[in-house]
Amino acid sequence: MEELLSAVIIGIVLGWLCKDWLHFPNGSNLYVLITLIFFVGIQLRNNGISLKEVLLNKQGLMMGAIFTLSSLIGGVISAFFLSMPITQGLAFSSGFGWYSLSSVVLTNAWGPMQGSIAFFNDLSREILSLFLIPLFMQHYRSTAIEITGATALDCTLPIIQKSGGIEVTPIAISFGMVTNLLPPLLLVFFSSFPI
């Protein structure tokens, strides 16, 4: 836990101190992410885990379905308590941590205020999950994976793998596949209703 926190703090400080002379080419983070996922795939194969075990992992797919259902139920409950339209609560809960998608879709549909809410909501999930994964992984593996939402397939995957070992990686990838396929559909559907 201390290592992760230290890495984040050092990264923020270095980014702030070096912002004037250290510039990364646009899109370079995409190539880093693709390389990272490529090496995860090599590591899975070297440990005897097949592509079928990764993509069609029953536990990961079931977790994705339960996560989606519980997120939508949470959106309805939040809408009730915050006195907002149910479709708006459902839309806010449909981002699953994919802040770059949810903020754009909801800004285009309902304006910058709702887009900002979606951005903060989903970015908060990702930031919190970076710190919560190591805490939950020992005793609550499913919870540790599910708190990541859509980021289980990309930026939080290395932390899931480091905290839980190679055996949880197929579960996280299957879960991440579900939580990356559904947000575009759900966000567009729920945001099509006027508020």
Swiss-Prot record:
One of its GO terms (molecular function) is L-lysine efflux transmembrane transporter activity. It is a multi-pass membrane protein. The keyword Transport applies. Its main location: membrane. It is found in: Cell inner membrane. The chain crosses the membrane at residues 4-24, 30-50, 61-81, 86-106, 117-137, 170-190. Disulfide bonds: none annotated. GO terms for cellular component: plasma membrane. It comes from the Bacteria. Keywords: Amino-acid transport, Cell inner membrane, Cell membrane, Membrane, Transmembrane, Transmembrane helix, Transport. InterPro entries: LysO (IPR005642). Mediates export of lysine. Belongs to the LysO family. This is Putative lysine exporter. It comes from Haemophilus influenzae (strain ATCC 51907 / DSM 11121 / KW20 / Rd). The lineage of its organism: Bacteria, Pseudomonadati, Pseudomonadota, Gammaproteobacteria, Pasteurellales.
